[in-house]
A protein has these predicted regions:
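Short, electropositive alpha-helical surface patch
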Residues: 5-22, 42-55, 105-119, 174-175, ...
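Glycine-rich, proline-tolerant flexible connector loops at the mouths of alpha/beta enzymes
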Residues: 1-12, 65, 122-127, 182-186
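Structured C-terminal cap/extension of enzyme domains
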Residues: 137, 141-144, 165-230
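Catalytic alpha/beta core domains of metabolic enzymes, predominantly
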Residues: 54-179, 189-192
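Glycine/small-residue-rich loop that forms an oxyanion/phosphate-binding "nest" at active or ligand-binding sites
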Residues: 33-50, 54, 58, 62-67
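Short, glycine/charge-rich beta-strand/loop segments that flank catalytic centers
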Residues: 28-38, 97-98
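Flexible glycine/acidic-rich beta-alpha junction loops that bind and position SAM and/or redox cofactors
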Residues: 33-39, 68, 123-129, 220-223
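Alpha-helix-loop-beta-strand connector modules within alpha/beta enzyme cores
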Residues: 2-30, 79-86, 139-146, 194-208
């Protein structure tokens, strides 16, 4: 398998190919891979014009990641938040543990983020917060500290389906796809992310939730201030 990369050329090609096929909100990662330097992780933030994303992820805390360590030092998080703001993008705040909510508060206090936020709970990483109903309910309760903010949940591996169902029931948004889970059912590889998205849409419909169009998704995710880069 190829090693993960954050080079602008690969992201530019992917964004153009996606744009030719469908209308979706484009979000790029600043997480990269374990051990990747911050400068490399921020590569996609250099894209401009029609090649630029609309959102970028912001990882706010260090966690154990299996047998590795996913390092997000305080000063690095501040730097990435500043670069996202300078690019005029909306951040998606990635939270892998309960204490990451407090780091998000610090970023708000320092003006590196502005309310309302869009928060993504990533649950089930071995070494971080477990994917359980109790944990998600606690996180959702803490969202009261971020007035007007939206949230979603990504369950890693076998946790993707139950977390998607729980998010729909609790009024949140759902993240699915091959980044977090490669199986459509036990032992059966998914033929791309599309089947996982289709399943998530059915979960929403079964819960009485409307699946957002691209236009509606932009209103939900992008109608918020961009933090001013100091």
């Amino acid at each position: 398998a190829r090693q993960p990369g954050q080079d602008t050329g690969s992201f530019r090609a992917a964004i153009r190919a996606i744009g030719q096929r469908c209308d979706v909100v484009i979000q790029t990662s600043t997480g990269g891979a374990v051990g990747m330097p911050i400068a490399e992780r921020c590569g996609p933030l250099q894209l401009t014009g029609s090649d630029a994303p609309e959102m970028a992820t912001l990882n706010v805390g260090t966690i154990n990641f299996g047998d590795d360590i996913f390092v997000n030092r305080r000063q690095d998080t501040m730097q990435v938040a500043q670069r996202i703001a300078a690019a005029g993008l909306v951040p998606e705040v990635e939270l892998y543990d309960l204490g990451h909510l407090d780091i998000a508060h610090e970023l708000l206090d320092k003006g590196r983020l502005q309310l309302p936020l869009h928060v993504q709970f990533v649950l089930g990483v071995r070494g971080a917060l477990a994917a359980s109903k109790r944990n998600l309910e606690l996180l959702v309760e803490r969202m009261q500290d971020f007035p007007g903010s939206s949230w979603g949940v990504a369950g890693v591996g076998r946790h993707q389906l139950p977390m998607a169902e729980l998010a729909a029931a609790l009024g949140g948004n759902i993240r699915v796809g091959l980044e977090d889970n490669i199986y459509i059912e036990k032992g059966v590889l998914a033929e791309g992310s599309a089947p996982l998205v289709e399943r998530a849409a059915k979960i929403c419909q079964a819960s009485g939730r409307k699946v957002a169009s691209a236009t509606e998704a932009r209103k939900i995710l992008l109608t918020r201030p961009v933090a001013v880069a100091p």
